[in-house]
Amino acid sequence: MKNFIEAQIKSSIEAKEKILKDGQYIEQIQSIVEIVIQAYKLGKKVLLCGNGGSAADSQHIAAEFVSKFRLDRKALPAIALTVNTSVLTSIGNDYSYKNIFERQVEAFGKEGDVLIGISTSGNSENITLAFKKAKEIGITTIGFLGKDGGENKNYCDFPLIVPSEDTPRVQEAHIMIGHIVCDIVEKELFGEKVDE
C-alpha cells in the first residue's frame, strides 16, 4: 500500500511538473488570468460548468470568486451552472442532458462574459454545446481540458489541455490552475500587483 500511495503522489507531481516546465502552459494561464481580469473590470461575470468532479471544480472556483480566495474584498460575480437541481433536471427532462449548460448560458450569459468549461476528457457534449451558445452571444470561452483536448478544444477560444491521460491527475491540475487564476485575479484587482 505504501508503494501505491507514493506512486500516486509522484504521478501527481509529474503531471504538474510538465505544466511548470513548458512555458506554453504558463503563457496560457497568464492569458486566462488577463481575460478574467478584463471581464471583471468591465463589470462582466464568469460562468463555469463541468460534469462529475469537474462540476465540483466549477462550484469550487465560483466560490473562490464570490467569497474570497485570500483577501477580504468585494465579491466577484461567478456562477457555477451545476448547482440548481430544478433547472438541471428540468432541462434534462424537457430537452436532453446535453443541453443542461447550453440553456443556462443562453439564460444567464451576456456579451463580454467568460465561460469556463471543465472536462477531463475534452469530449463532454454538453460543454461543446455550451461553448457554441456562448460564441453566439459573444462570451469568451475557456476550456480546462485533459488528454488530447477532445472535441471541446475545437469550440473554445482558449483551450488549456493538461498533459495527462489520467483523469485524477487532470482534475488535480485543473483545481491547481483554478486556484492560480483566482489568486492572481484577486491580487490584481484588489491587492498588490503580481510580478511578471
UniProtKB/Swiss-Prot annotation:
Names of the cofactor(s): Zn(2+)
UniProt cross-references to Gene3D superfamilies, sorted A to Z: Glucose-6-phosphate isomerase like protein, domain 1
Catalysed reactions listed for this entry: 2 D-sedoheptulose 7-phosphate = D-glycero-alpha-D-manno-heptose 7-phosphate + D-glycero-beta-D-manno-heptose 7-phosphate
Protein name listed in UniProt: Phosphoheptose isomerase
More about this protein: The reaction produces a racemic mixture of D-glycero-alpha-D-manno-heptose 7-phosphate and D-glycero-beta-D-manno-heptose 7-phosphate.
Catalytic class of the enzyme: isomerase
Matching PANTHER family: DNAA INITIATOR-ASSOCIATING PROTEIN DIAA, SEDOHEPTULOSE 7-PHOSPHATE ISOMERASE / DNAA INITIATOR-ASSOCIATING FACTOR FOR REPLICATION INITIATION
Statement: the UniProt record of this protein carries the keyword Repeat: no
Organism: Clostridium acetobutylicum (strain ATCC 824 / DSM 792 / JCM 1419 / IAM 19013 / LMG 5710 / NBRC 13948 / NRRL B-527 / VKM B-1787 / 2291 / W)
Binding site for Zn(2+): 60, 64, 171, 179
Family the UniProt entry places it in: Belongs to the SIS family. GmhA subfamily.
Annotated metabolic or biological route of this protein: Carbohydrate biosynthesis; D-glycero-D-manno-heptose 7-phosphate biosynthesis; D-glycero-alpha-D-manno-heptose 7-phosphate and D-glycero-beta-D-manno-heptose 7-phosphate from sedoheptulose 7-phosphate: step 1/1
Keyword annotations from UniProtKB, A to Z: Capsule biogenesis/degradation, Carbohydrate metabolism, Cytoplasm, Isomerase, Metal-binding, Zinc
InterPro entries reported for this sequence: GmhA/DiaA, Phosphoheptose_Isoase, SIS_dom, SIS_dom_sf, SIS_GmhA/DiaA_subfam
Record EC number: 5.3.1.28
Its job: Catalyzes the isomerization of sedoheptulose 7-phosphate in D-glycero-D-manno-heptose 7-phosphate.
GO molecular function terms noted in the UniProt entry: carbohydrate derivative binding; D-sedoheptulose 7-phosphate isomerase activity; zinc ion binding
